[in-house]
Curated annotation (Swiss-Prot):
Residues 106-115 have a biased composition (Basic and acidic residues). The active site is at D441. GO terms for biological process: cell division; cellular hyperosmotic response; cellular response to osmotic stress; MAPK cascade; p38MAPK cascade; positive regulation of G2/M transition of mitotic cell cycle; positive regulation of silent mating-type cassette heterochromatin formation. This is Protein kinase wis1. Dephosphorylated by pyp1 and pyp2. Keywords: ATP-binding, Cell cycle, Cell division, Kinase, Mitosis, Nucleotide-binding, Phosphoprotein, Serine/threonine-protein kinase, Transferase. Its EC number is 2.7.12.2. It comes from Schizosaccharomyces pombe (strain 972 / ATCC 24843). Residues 1-141, 188-263 are annotated as: Disordered. The modification Phosphoserine is found at S168, S253, S469. GO terms for cellular component: cytoplasm; cytosol; Mcs4 RR-MAPKKK complex; nucleus. PROSITE patterns: PROTEIN_KINASE_ATP, PROTEIN_KINASE_DOM, PROTEIN_KINASE_ST. It is an enzyme of class 2 (transferase).
Length: 605
């Protein structure tokens, strides 16, 4: 391989430079001379070619003396020239040279490779950072034109809002708005641009750019403000939540997440977030202290109950031992229990709290009635307490149970029926005359008997069957409601749909069921529950068989009169001839109760 002047050609890979005497675009063009000179014979291979040094000269003279060029300098000039495109130089080799040692620059030491040199900002280390972007005026513009453009750019910068001036400079384009090929910013500059407190110019209105930047930093600014109140209400979450501007914002705790983000949360929003199902009953239920506070009524805790009347009952779960389950009602379970300090056997009724207003109303109603209504015809009240989400009511234990467990085959003894009817009438009379209370749930399961022959009322329209047997709880079609309660509508013949007379109807059905030993409207006699209710409302009322005395039949017939205004009240019933007849008669209620218990036990065995 030789030069045009037939001079030996040698290559040096340690020195490579391009002479600046001609423009970069002239390299390799016709008229330019590529000369290679040998500087050492020690690197000559067997074919005589030298790979010692390589130099490129763009002089058109072709002199061998011009082939020596100094190595490229690594120093950064104080005023670097504008970057220009560096041409790619391809060295052609003959077939013979390619068959020998290949000229591979990648096999050399990295420090010996030629590098592209770019201007670096003063005082900035570009190691490990992206390349510095070119200036805002690329191209081969003359110095005076560049100065004019810089002055124009500076004048425009002064007139722009300060928020834009803070994030722009003559050498750094704005992110998202600069020229193509803009480079990432250093972390310090990026942090400054993403400040949460954009600065507004005091003299100039906020520009669209500043608004868009502020909206991007704070998403709350993106909310529309032009919709009316009705639109705002429709978009608001359900519940008592008003996000109108009239609502004042409450201060936020400095340590809260909202405070660190610079947000003010309306108090209604805080209430909606923190609200739980128990919040609705926060005026009654205090979960921290474990207290139920029925205002102006009673306060329950784990140690007992205090009534507003001044009565207090101290009792707790640690003093009670559950013996057996007696039955289940609509809202709880009844246990036979032993009070250890006194040795008294009692009925313990557990009512599990549910987040319904009706449950709380029923609990306080029963507690209020039990502790006020002191009567030999109403079960005694021993106390109550609240623990582990349940209300426990302690009351008198009636060992013979409810009447529905004792009338098997029907009660043929009119004396037992009359004494039972008298006790129920006296209990209902006490509730109405002394406490203005209507029982609303008179039926055999709520009439209790003990082995001494005493008959007492329980379950005052609160929890359904107090000691209903488990087998009886499945009978949901039996209704003791008066026809006026079943009918849909308002008053009937000028009389309200529910009065004392409704309990009188229920009393008549109860006495009739005890005498017959079965419910007077047997479900198996009707095709559906609707047919059964229709018979109660529109059919002839049932009555006692002719085998019973006329007084007994008259008593039941008056109670079951379809016209509530023609039914007797409690005073008339208490003085009915049938009841008066057996008031002074010798009726052994204790023997009957014991015999019924014995018969029930034999049936169980």
């Amino acid at each position: 391989m030789s030069s045009p002047n037939n001079q030996p050609l040698s290559c040096s890979l340690r020195q490579l430079s391009i002479s600046p005497t001609a423009p970069p675009g002239d390299v390799g063009t016709p008229g330019s001379l590529l000369s290679l000179s040998s500087s050492s014979s020690s690197n000559t291979d067997s074919s005589g070619s030298s790979l010692g040094s390589l130099s490129l000269n763009s002089n058109s003279s072709g002199s061998d003396n011009d082939s020596k060029v100094s190595s490229p300098s690594r120093e950064i000039p104080s005023d670097p020239p504008l970057p220009r495109a560096v041409p790619t130089v391809r060295l052609g080799r003959s077939t013979s040279s390619r068959s020998r040692n290949s000229l591979n620059l990648d096999m050399k030491d990295p420090s010996e490779k030629p590098r592209r040199s770019l201007p670096t900002a003063a005082g900035q280390n570009n190691i490990g950072s992206p390349p510095t972007p070119p200036g805002p005026f690329p191209g081969g513009l003359s110095t005076d034109i560049q100065e004019k453009l810089k002055a124009f750019h500076a004048s425009r910068s002064k007139s722009m809002p300060e928020v834009v001036n803070k994030i722009s400079s003559p050498t750094t384009p704005i992110v998202g708005m600069g020229q193509r090929g803009s480079y990432p910013l250093p972390n310090s500059q990026l942090a400054g641009r993403l400040s949460n407190s954009p600065v507004k110019s005091p003299n100039m209105p906020e520009s669209g750019l500043a608004k868009s930047l502020a909206a991007a930093r704070n998403p709350l600014l993106n909310r529309p403000t032009s919709f009316n109140r009705q639109t705002r209400i429709r978009r608001a979450p359900p519940g008592k939540l008003d996000l109108s501007n009239s609502n004042p914002t409450s201060p936020v705790s400095p340590s809260s997440m909202a405070s660190r983000r610079g947000l003010n949360i309306p108090p209604t929003l805080k209430q909606a977030v923190s609200e739980t199902p128990f919040s609705t009953f926060s005026d009654i239920l205090d979960a921290k202290s474990g207290t139920l506070n029925f205002k102006n009524k009673a306060v329950l805790n784990s140690e007992g109950v205090n009534f507003s009347s001044g009565s207090s009952f101290r009792i707790n779960m640690s003093e009670i031992i559950k013996l057996e389950e007696l039955g289940k009602g609509n809202y709880g379970v009844v246990y036979k229990a032993l009070h250890q300090p006194t040795g008294v056997t009692m009925a313990l009724k557990e009512i599990r709290l549910s987040l319904e207003e009706a449950t709380f109303n029923q609990i306080i109603m029963e507690l209020d009635i039990l502790h006020k209504a002191v009567s030999p015809y109403i079960v005694d009240f021993y106390g109550a307490f609240f623990v582990e989400g349940s209300v426990f009511i302690c009351m008198e234990y009636m060992d013979a149970g409810s009447m529905d467990k004792l009338y098997a085959g029907g009660i043929k003894d009119e004396g037992v029926l009359a004494r039972t009817a008298y006790a129920v009438v006296q209990g209902l009379k006490t509730l109405k005359e002394e406490h203005n209370i209507i029982h609303r749930d008179v039926k055999p399961t709520n009439v209790l008997v003990n082995s001494n022959g005493q008959v007492k009322l329980c379950d005052f329209g609160v929890s359904g069957n107090l000691v209903a047997s488990i087998s009886k709880t499945n009978i949901g079609c039996q209704s003791y409601m008066a026809p006026e309660r079943i009918r849909v509508g308002g008053p009937t013949n000028g009389v309200l749909t529910y009065t004392v007379q409704a309990d009188v109807w229920s009393l008549g059905l109860t006495i009739l069921e005890m005498a017959l030993g079965a419910y007077p409207y047997p479900p198996e006699s009707y095709t559906s529950i609707f047919a059964q209710l229709s018979a109660i409302c529109d059919g002839d009322p049932p009555s006692l068989p002719d085998s019973f005395s006329p007084e007994a039949r008259d008593f039941v017939n008056k109670c079951l009169n379809k016209n509530p205004s023609l039914r007797p009240d409690y005073h008339e019933l208490a003085n009915h001839p049938w009841l008066l007849k057996y008031q002074n008669a010798d009726v052994d209620m204790a023997s009957w109760a014991k015999g019924a218990l014995k018969e029930k036990g034999e049936k169980r065995s």
